[in-house]
From Swiss-Prot:
Subunit annotation: Homodimer.
Catalytic activity field: O-phospho-L-serine + 2-oxoglutarate = 3-phosphooxypyruvate + L-glutamate; 4-(phosphooxy)-L-threonine + 2-oxoglutarate = (R)-3-hydroxy-2-oxo-4-phosphooxybutanoate + L-glutamate
Co-factor remark: Binds 1 pyridoxal phosphate per subunit.
Family recorded in the similarity comment: Belongs to the class-V pyridoxal-phosphate-dependent aminotransferase family. SerC subfamily.
Example GO biological process: L-serine biosynthetic process
Subcellular location(s) per record: Cytoplasm
Organism: Streptococcus suis (strain 05ZYH33)
Protein name: Phosphoserine aminotransferase
Binding site for pyridoxal 5'-phosphate: A75, S76, W100, T155, D175, Q198, N239, T240
InterPro entries for this protein: Aminotrans_V_dom (IPR000192), Pser_aminoTfrase (IPR022278), PyrdxlP-dep_Trfase (IPR015424), PyrdxlP-dep_Trfase_major (IPR015421), PyrdxlP-dep_Trfase_small (IPR015422)
Cofactor field: pyridoxal 5'-phosphate
SUPFAM superfamilies, sorted: PLP-dependent transferases
Lineage of origin: Bacteria, Bacillati, Bacillota, Bacilli, Lactobacillales
PANTHER family the UniProt entry points to: PHOSPHOSERINE AMINOTRANSFERASE (PTHR43247:SF1)
Protein backbone atom coordinates (compact mmCIF):
# COMPACT_ATOMS: atom_id res chain seq x y z
CA UNK A 1 0.00 0.00 0.00
CA UNK A 2 1.31 3.42 -0.97
CA UNK A 3 1.34 5.93 1.89
CA UNK A 4 0.44 9.54 1.11
CA UNK A 5 1.36 12.05 3.81
CA UNK A 6 -1.02 15.01 3.95
CA UNK A 7 0.58 16.46 7.10
CA UNK A 8 0.53 20.25 7.39
CA UNK A 9 4.01 20.17 8.87
CA UNK A 10 6.42 18.57 9.34
CA UNK A 11 5.48 17.54 5.87
CA UNK A 12 6.38 15.32 2.96
CA UNK A 13 9.89 15.77 1.56
CA UNK A 14 10.98 15.01 -2.02
CA UNK A 15 11.97 11.36 -2.37
CA UNK A 16 15.16 12.23 -4.35
CA UNK A 17 16.22 14.47 -1.46
CA UNK A 18 15.70 11.72 1.11
CA UNK A 19 17.55 9.22 -1.08
CA UNK A 20 20.53 11.54 -1.46
CA UNK A 21 20.57 12.30 2.25
CA UNK A 22 20.49 8.55 2.91
CA UNK A 23 23.42 7.95 0.56
CA UNK A 24 25.47 10.73 2.19
CA UNK A 25 24.40 10.06 5.76
CA UNK A 26 27.52 8.25 7.01
CA UNK A 27 30.09 9.94 4.79
CA UNK A 28 29.43 13.41 3.41
CA UNK A 29 31.60 14.41 0.46
CA UNK A 30 34.37 11.96 1.36
CA UNK A 31 34.85 13.56 4.77
CA UNK A 32 34.31 10.33 6.68
CA UNK A 33 31.70 12.16 8.75
CA UNK A 34 27.97 12.70 8.69
CA UNK A 35 26.73 16.28 8.42
CA UNK A 36 25.13 15.57 11.80
CA UNK A 37 28.57 15.42 13.44
CA UNK A 38 30.40 17.97 11.34
CA UNK A 39 31.76 21.25 12.74
CA UNK A 40 29.74 24.24 11.60
CA UNK A 41 33.09 26.01 11.10
CA UNK A 42 34.38 23.37 8.68
CA UNK A 43 34.87 24.01 4.97
CA UNK A 44 32.33 21.32 4.10
CA UNK A 45 29.61 22.99 6.14
CA UNK A 46 30.63 26.42 4.89
CA UNK A 47 30.02 25.11 1.37
CA UNK A 48 26.63 23.71 2.47
CA UNK A 49 25.29 26.90 4.04
CA UNK A 50 26.64 29.13 1.27
CA UNK A 51 25.23 26.79 -1.36
CA UNK A 52 21.84 26.81 0.35
CA UNK A 53 21.77 30.60 0.37
CA UNK A 54 22.96 30.92 -3.23
CA UNK A 55 20.32 28.53 -4.58
CA UNK A 56 17.54 30.16 -2.56
CA UNK A 57 18.61 33.57 -3.86
CA UNK A 58 18.43 32.25 -7.41
CA UNK A 59 15.02 30.60 -6.91
CA UNK A 60 13.39 33.66 -5.35
CA UNK A 61 15.38 36.32 -7.24
CA UNK A 62 16.52 37.81 -3.93
CA UNK A 63 18.33 41.14 -4.53
CA UNK A 64 21.83 41.75 -3.18
CA UNK A 65 20.56 44.31 -0.66
CA UNK A 66 18.67 41.60 1.22
CA UNK A 67 20.25 39.34 3.83
CA UNK A 68 19.37 35.65 4.06
CA UNK A 69 19.59 34.22 7.57
CA UNK A 70 19.06 30.67 8.83
CA UNK A 71 17.74 30.79 12.40
CA UNK A 72 16.38 28.49 15.09
CA UNK A 73 13.19 28.74 17.12
CA UNK A 74 10.61 28.23 14.38
CA UNK A 75 8.51 30.93 12.75
CA UNK A 76 6.76 31.41 16.09
CA UNK A 77 9.90 32.98 17.57
CA UNK A 78 9.72 35.64 14.87
CA UNK A 79 6.41 36.76 16.39
CA UNK A 80 8.52 38.13 19.26
CA UNK A 81 11.68 39.04 17.37
CA UNK A 82 9.89 41.22 14.82
CA UNK A 83 8.41 43.82 17.19
CA UNK A 84 11.48 43.62 19.41
CA UNK A 85 13.75 44.53 16.49
CA UNK A 86 11.59 46.91 14.48
CA UNK A 87 8.64 48.35 16.41
CA UNK A 88 10.06 50.06 19.48
CA UNK A 89 8.43 53.45 19.96
CA UNK A 90 6.25 53.05 16.85
CA UNK A 91 2.96 51.64 15.63
CA UNK A 92 2.88 48.13 14.17
CA UNK A 93 -0.09 46.89 12.14
CA UNK A 94 -1.32 43.30 11.94
CA UNK A 95 -3.57 41.92 9.22
CA UNK A 96 -5.12 38.76 10.65
CA UNK A 97 -6.60 36.33 8.14
CA UNK A 98 -6.05 33.13 10.10
CA UNK A 99 -4.97 31.47 13.32
CA UNK A 100 -1.24 32.02 12.81
CA UNK A 101 -1.69 35.71 12.05
CA UNK A 102 -3.69 36.00 15.26
CA UNK A 103 -0.85 34.35 17.18
CA UNK A 104 1.60 36.88 15.75
CA UNK A 105 -0.68 39.74 16.84
CA UNK A 106 -1.25 38.20 20.28
CA UNK A 107 2.49 37.93 20.88
CA UNK A 108 2.94 41.56 19.85
CA UNK A 109 0.26 42.64 22.33
CA UNK A 110 2.02 40.67 25.08
CA UNK A 111 5.36 42.26 24.27
CA UNK A 112 3.85 45.76 24.22
CA UNK A 113 3.26 45.41 27.98
CA UNK A 114 7.02 45.61 28.53
CA UNK A 115 8.40 47.26 25.37
CA UNK A 116 7.03 50.64 24.28
CA UNK A 117 5.22 50.24 20.95
CA UNK A 118 1.62 50.10 19.74
CA UNK A 119 0.36 46.93 18.03
CA UNK A 120 -2.78 47.67 15.98
CA UNK A 121 -5.22 45.17 14.50
CA UNK A 122 -5.58 46.42 10.92
CA UNK A 123 -8.18 43.86 9.94
CA UNK A 124 -9.46 40.45 10.98
CA UNK A 125 -12.03 37.93 9.78
CA UNK A 126 -12.07 35.88 12.96
CA UNK A 127 -15.80 36.61 13.35
CA UNK A 128 -16.49 34.52 10.22
CA UNK A 129 -13.93 31.84 11.17
CA UNK A 130 -11.47 33.27 8.63
CA UNK A 131 -13.59 32.09 5.69
CA UNK A 132 -12.19 34.99 3.64
CA UNK A 133 -9.30 37.43 3.85
CA UNK A 134 -9.67 40.74 5.70
CA UNK A 135 -9.71 44.06 3.87
CA UNK A 136 -8.71 47.54 5.00
CA UNK A 137 -8.41 51.15 3.88
CA UNK A 138 -4.77 52.06 3.28
CA UNK A 139 -5.52 55.57 4.57
CA UNK A 140 -6.11 54.05 8.01
CA UNK A 141 -2.39 53.23 8.16
CA UNK A 142 -0.06 55.77 9.76
CA UNK A 143 2.73 56.21 7.18
CA UNK A 144 5.29 56.49 10.01
CA UNK A 145 4.43 53.02 11.33
CA UNK A 146 7.15 50.40 11.68
CA UNK A 147 5.51 47.73 9.53
CA UNK A 148 2.41 45.87 8.40
CA UNK A 149 2.54 42.15 9.21
CA UNK A 150 0.58 39.59 7.20
CA UNK A 151 0.50 35.86 6.54
CA UNK A 152 0.63 34.87 2.87
CA UNK A 153 -0.93 31.43 3.38
CA UNK A 154 -3.29 30.43 6.15
CA UNK A 155 -2.42 26.80 6.74
CA UNK A 156 -5.42 25.97 8.92
CA UNK A 157 -8.15 27.87 7.08
CA UNK A 158 -6.96 27.34 3.49
CA UNK A 159 -6.77 30.94 2.24
CA UNK A 160 -3.84 32.73 0.63
CA UNK A 161 -2.74 36.28 -0.20
CA UNK A 162 -1.39 36.35 -3.77
CA UNK A 163 -1.47 40.12 -4.39
CA UNK A 164 0.25 42.17 -1.70
CA UNK A 165 -2.02 45.06 -0.63
CA UNK A 166 -1.14 48.76 -0.71
CA UNK A 167 0.06 49.66 2.80
CA UNK A 168 0.46 53.42 2.35
CA UNK A 169 4.22 53.15 2.02
CA UNK A 170 4.69 51.21 5.26
CA UNK A 171 7.10 48.23 5.03
CA UNK A 172 5.48 44.79 4.75
CA UNK A 173 6.63 41.79 6.78
CA UNK A 174 5.28 38.41 5.66
CA UNK A 175 5.04 35.04 7.33
CA UNK A 176 5.47 32.86 4.24
CA UNK A 177 5.92 29.58 6.10
CA UNK A 178 3.44 27.45 4.18
CA UNK A 179 3.72 28.72 0.61
CA UNK A 180 7.30 29.89 0.20
CA UNK A 181 8.67 28.42 -3.08
CA UNK A 182 5.12 27.29 -3.94
CA UNK A 183 3.97 30.57 -5.47
CA UNK A 184 5.90 33.44 -7.01
CA UNK A 185 6.28 36.61 -4.93
CA UNK A 186 8.41 39.66 -5.67
CA UNK A 187 10.87 39.84 -2.77
CA UNK A 188 11.21 43.60 -3.22
CA UNK A 189 7.55 44.00 -2.19
CA UNK A 190 8.62 43.07 1.34
CA UNK A 191 10.95 44.49 3.96
CA UNK A 192 11.16 41.02 5.46
CA UNK A 193 9.99 37.49 4.71
CA UNK A 194 10.23 34.61 7.14
CA UNK A 195 9.32 30.95 6.91
CA UNK A 196 9.54 27.90 9.12
CA UNK A 197 11.17 25.14 7.10
CA UNK A 198 8.90 22.20 7.86
CA UNK A 199 6.39 22.68 5.06
CA UNK A 200 8.10 23.55 1.76
CA UNK A 201 11.77 23.93 2.67
CA UNK A 202 12.97 21.02 4.78
CA UNK A 203 12.74 19.44 8.22
CA UNK A 204 11.73 21.29 11.36
CA UNK A 205 14.52 23.11 13.15
CA UNK A 206 15.46 25.95 10.83
CA UNK A 207 13.67 29.18 9.95
CA UNK A 208 14.60 31.18 6.86
CA UNK A 209 14.61 34.97 7.20
CA UNK A 210 15.03 37.28 4.20
CA UNK A 211 15.41 40.89 5.31
CA UNK A 212 16.30 44.12 3.53
CA UNK A 213 19.58 45.49 4.90
CA UNK A 214 18.34 49.04 5.43
CA UNK A 215 15.41 47.67 7.45
CA UNK A 216 17.64 45.98 10.02
CA UNK A 217 17.58 47.44 13.52
CA UNK A 218 20.36 49.85 14.45
CA UNK A 219 19.82 49.69 18.20
CA UNK A 220 21.14 46.85 20.37
CA UNK A 221 18.48 44.36 21.45
CA UNK A 222 17.82 42.86 24.86
CA UNK A 223 19.41 39.64 23.62
CA UNK A 224 22.06 39.01 20.98
CA UNK A 225 20.30 35.80 19.98
CA UNK A 226 17.14 37.80 19.19
CA UNK A 227 18.97 40.51 17.25
CA UNK A 228 18.55 40.21 13.47
CA UNK A 229 21.51 42.50 12.80
CA UNK A 230 23.89 40.37 14.86
CA UNK A 231 22.60 37.20 13.22
CA UNK A 232 23.01 38.74 9.76
CA UNK A 233 26.49 40.11 10.46
CA UNK A 234 27.56 36.65 11.61
CA UNK A 235 26.17 34.94 8.50
CA UNK A 236 23.84 32.70 10.57
CA UNK A 237 26.82 31.45 12.60
CA UNK A 238 26.54 33.57 15.76
CA UNK A 239 26.03 30.25 17.52
CA UNK A 240 25.85 26.68 16.26
CA UNK A 241 23.14 26.61 13.59
CA UNK A 242 20.73 23.71 12.90
CA UNK A 243 23.28 22.23 10.53
CA UNK A 244 21.47 19.12 9.32
CA UNK A 245 18.22 20.99 8.70
CA UNK A 246 20.14 23.52 6.61
CA UNK A 247 21.78 20.68 4.66
CA UNK A 248 18.40 19.09 3.84
CA UNK A 249 17.03 22.53 2.92
CA UNK A 250 19.90 22.97 0.48
CA UNK A 251 18.98 19.67 -1.18
CA UNK A 252 15.34 20.75 -1.40
CA UNK A 253 16.33 24.07 -2.99
CA UNK A 254 18.37 22.15 -5.57
CA UNK A 255 15.40 19.85 -6.21
CA UNK A 256 13.07 22.81 -6.82
CA UNK A 257 15.65 24.23 -9.23
CA UNK A 258 15.81 20.91 -11.11
CA UNK A 259 12.00 20.85 -11.36
CA UNK A 260 12.17 24.21 -13.14
CA UNK A 261 12.14 26.75 -10.34
CA UNK A 262 9.34 28.52 -8.51
CA UNK A 263 7.32 29.40 -11.61
CA UNK A 264 7.17 25.76 -12.71
CA UNK A 265 6.49 24.69 -9.14
CA UNK A 266 3.53 27.07 -8.93
CA UNK A 267 2.15 25.73 -12.22
CA UNK A 268 2.38 22.16 -10.87
CA UNK A 269 0.77 23.19 -7.58
CA UNK A 270 -2.14 24.98 -9.24
CA UNK A 271 -2.85 21.98 -11.46
CA UNK A 272 -2.53 19.59 -8.53
CA UNK A 273 -4.75 21.58 -6.15
CA UNK A 274 -7.16 22.34 -9.01
CA UNK A 275 -7.95 18.65 -9.36
CA UNK A 276 -9.15 18.48 -5.77
CA UNK A 277 -10.97 21.81 -5.80
CA UNK A 278 -12.78 20.89 -9.01
CA UNK A 279 -13.97 17.62 -7.54
CA UNK A 280 -15.13 19.25 -4.28
CA UNK A 281 -16.97 21.98 -6.23
CA UNK A 282 -18.97 19.50 -8.31
CA UNK A 283 -19.63 17.23 -5.36
CA UNK A 284 -22.86 17.47 -3.39
CA UNK A 285 -21.22 15.65 -0.48
CA UNK A 286 -18.07 17.67 0.32
CA UNK A 287 -17.64 21.41 0.80
CA UNK A 288 -14.68 23.76 1.07
CA UNK A 289 -15.20 26.60 3.60
CA UNK A 290 -13.30 29.31 1.68
CA UNK A 291 -15.85 31.80 0.33
CA UNK A 292 -13.87 33.30 -2.56
CA UNK A 293 -12.22 31.01 -5.10
CA UNK A 294 -9.48 33.55 -5.84
CA UNK A 295 -8.40 33.35 -2.19
CA UNK A 296 -8.02 29.58 -2.12
CA UNK A 297 -4.67 28.18 -1.05
CA UNK A 298 -2.77 25.90 -3.41
CA UNK A 299 -1.01 24.39 -0.39
CA UNK A 300 -3.73 23.60 2.15
CA UNK A 301 -7.24 22.47 1.22
CA UNK A 302 -9.73 22.02 4.07
CA UNK A 303 -13.01 20.25 3.40
CA UNK A 304 -15.91 18.72 5.31
CA UNK A 305 -18.57 16.07 4.76
CA UNK A 306 -22.24 16.53 5.73
CA UNK A 307 -21.63 15.81 9.45
CA UNK A 308 -18.95 15.60 12.13
CA UNK A 309 -19.71 11.91 12.50
CA UNK A 310 -19.01 11.33 8.82
CA UNK A 311 -15.86 13.45 9.09
CA UNK A 312 -14.58 11.16 11.84
CA UNK A 313 -15.48 8.08 9.79
CA UNK A 314 -13.76 9.54 6.72
CA UNK A 315 -10.54 10.21 8.65
CA UNK A 316 -10.52 6.71 10.13
CA UNK A 317 -11.11 4.96 6.81
CA UNK A 318 -8.79 7.25 4.85
CA UNK A 319 -5.99 6.64 7.33
CA UNK A 320 -6.46 2.89 7.03
CA UNK A 321 -6.32 3.26 3.24
CA UNK A 322 -2.93 5.01 3.38
CA UNK A 323 -4.00 8.66 3.38
CA UNK A 324 -2.14 9.75 6.50
CA UNK A 325 -2.52 12.96 8.52
CA UNK A 326 -5.62 14.10 6.66
CA UNK A 327 -7.54 15.10 9.77
CA UNK A 328 -8.27 18.83 9.91
CA UNK A 329 -6.67 21.08 12.51
CA UNK A 330 -8.13 20.54 15.97
CA UNK A 331 -9.47 24.12 15.99
CA UNK A 332 -11.66 23.66 12.89
CA UNK A 333 -12.22 19.92 12.47
CA UNK A 334 -13.09 18.23 9.20
CA UNK A 335 -10.32 17.20 6.85
CA UNK A 336 -7.33 18.97 5.33
CA UNK A 337 -5.20 17.96 2.38
CA UNK A 338 -1.83 19.70 2.53
CA UNK A 339 -0.39 19.60 -0.97
CA UNK A 340 3.06 21.07 -0.55
CA UNK A 341 5.68 21.11 -3.29
CA UNK A 342 6.87 17.57 -2.64
CA UNK A 343 3.39 16.04 -2.53
CA UNK A 344 2.85 13.88 -5.64
CA UNK A 345 0.02 14.49 -8.10
CA UNK A 346 -0.83 10.79 -8.00
CA UNK A 347 -1.70 11.16 -4.33
CA UNK A 348 -4.36 13.73 -5.22
CA UNK A 349 -5.78 11.47 -7.94
CA UNK A 350 -6.04 8.54 -5.54
CA UNK A 351 -7.52 10.69 -2.77
CA UNK A 352 -10.27 11.85 -5.13
CA UNK A 353 -11.08 8.23 -6.00
CA UNK A 354 -11.33 7.42 -2.30
CA UNK A 355 -13.54 10.47 -1.73
CA UNK A 356 -15.88 9.39 -4.52
CA UNK A 357 -16.18 5.89 -3.09
CA UNK A 358 -16.79 7.20 0.43
CA UNK A 359 -19.46 9.62 -0.79
CA UNK A 360 -21.36 6.84 -2.58
CA UNK A 361 -21.20 4.53 0.43
CA UNK A 362 -22.31 7.23 2.88
CA UNK A 363 -24.77 9.29 0.86
Amino acid sequence: MTIYNFSAGPAVLPKPVLERAQAEFLDYNGSGMSVLEMSHRSKDFDDIIKGAEATLRELMAIPDNYKVIFLQGGASLEFTMIPLNFAQGKKAYYLVGGSWGKKAYTEAVKLSKTIAFEPILLGSTEDITYAELPTFDKNDIDPTAAYVHLTTNNTIEGTAVYDIPDTNGVPVIADMSSNILAARYNVEDFAMIYAGAQKNIGPAGVTVVIVREDFLNDQPMLSSMLDYRIQAENDSLYNTPPAYSIYISKLVFEWVKEIGGVDEMEKINREKSGLLYDYIDQSNFYTNPVRKKEERSVANIPFVSPSEELDAKFVKEATAAGFKNIKGHRSVGGMRASLYNAFPRQGVVELIEFMKKFAVENA
